[in-house]
Amino acid sequence: MTKTTMHWLAHFQIILLCIWLMCPPSSQAIKCDTCGKECASACGTKHFRTCCFNYLRKRSDPDALRQSSNRRLIDFILLQGRALFTQELRERRHNGTLMDLGLNTYYP
């Protein structure tokens, strides 16, 4: 092997090692029964996050957030922010403070 080939091979191995170290082990993933029996059937789907969010919100237990991984905690926070934003939009539409113009205004 040439010196250049060995150099690139070493870089490639270092990159693979970094990728392997960055991948979280499966033991850190949230378990299907963490969010109650009603969410277990939705495990592995997009609906599971929503179900889990609602379950944790109902429980209002601070320890429930500590049990989830950091990634799930970020998801929880983003879902909570989205829910508050959606609720605010709904209230603005209900109060008439948000103009909801349909496409019919522009395309008769």
UniProtKB/Swiss-Prot annotation:
Q: Which residues form the propeptide?
A: 57-108
A GO molecular function annotation here is: G protein-coupled receptor binding
Q: Where in the cell is it found?
A: Secreted
- Cystine links in this protein are 32-43, 35-52, 39-51
Q: Which residues form the signal peptide?
A: 1-29
Q: Which GO terms describe its biological process?
A: G protein-coupled receptor signaling pathway
Source organism, top-level taxon = Eukaryota
Q: Recite the UniProt keywords alphabetically.
A: Cleavage on pair of basic residues, Disulfide bond, Secreted, Signal
What do the Gene Ontology cellular component annotations say? Answer: extracellular space
Role according to the record:
Activates the G-protein coupled receptor TrissinR in vitro, leading to increased intracellular calcium ion levels.
| Record protein name field | Trissin
Q: Which organism is it from?
A: Drosophila melanogaster
